[in-house]
Amino acid sequence: LDKRVAELHKNNIRVRFIGDRARFAPLLQKGMTEAEAKTADNNGMTLVIAVSYGGQWDMAHAAQQLALQVQAGQINPQAMTTDDFQQLFQSQIQMSDLPPVDLLIRTGGDFRISNFLLWQAAYAEFYFSDLLWPDFNEAALDAALESYANRQRRFGRTSAQVEAHHA
């Protein structure tokens, strides 16, 4: 881990781990925390590494954190609108400080998201490839990006609504 983090740091890449770290040995947890701290100020790219992560776990964990805040009297759910709650919930999920997912590439020929980034990928565009991950190369990435570039991002709106908004 140290060797890889040094290389990532040298290339101005920020490292983030998402998932249930409590399932790992304390030494590995410490290594994850140190890697994030060492690269925290890097702004070239962000590498997000999912460890013991599941979208359902992520949302349940966020709900649990909010329930604890309600119990402590820090949040009054009766005084909140649905939009307020949605923003508060968003602040508790993993990757809350990162932009939403734009493109999710699924390799291996499967047509499912497999419990991955359920909240964060709400308006993501999906690209499915028959290639297995080890075989997914630069040409395959270019094909995925080209497909993405030719799509109309609607974010829950109809094509007519998007076109009217841009007119």
Predicted features and spans:
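Flexible, compositionally biased loop and terminal segments
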Residues: 1-167
